[in-house]
Amino acid sequence: KAETEKAYGQLMKAKIQSIRAINSINRDSLLPAVRRVESEYAKTSDKALKAVYAAVLYKIYNMEGNRLHADNEKGHEAKTAEYRKAAIADVNMLGKTKTGTFEPMVVEGTNANIFGGDLLSVIANETGQYLPMFEYYNKSGNRRAACIAALKYVQTEVKEEAGKYAVKKSPFVFALDSVIHVYEDLDVAG
């Protein structure tokens, strides 16, 4: 019913809850459940729904991939990367799609208004893809969202070895300082 009514949130919530329940009751049933979602992902022509399926599959493979491909670690890594890339393949479409279509799966957080309640912010956050998120908001002129995306990017991508650098020479501190300098006029930067 949810699929025919395009109630994507209801549909996705049901799929996720179903996979979690199957996994908690009988861990051997995880693979068939994932294969069903993969089949639905392959069949859909709805770009927004395809992105949501890809994000869900990315999360499953990221958390349970070693069980899904126990005989082939590279297969698990390849699937994880494939679904992560597919989840955010159409950044512009995701930026224009409002998450209301996907309720109750997507519950608006405290920053939802900064991102305009769009699907891009949800999927980029779920898959940890902050650079495309930053680029989209920067290009579209949403400086508050670009600032948050840039801060998340620095937080997750600028790596350093603990204790290797003095604070004054830390790549993380330099990157963070640069972001704050660019967006110092915004409340979300401070």
Question: Residue locations for each model-derived region?
Answer:
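Extracytoplasmic/secretory-pathway proteins
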Residues: 1-190
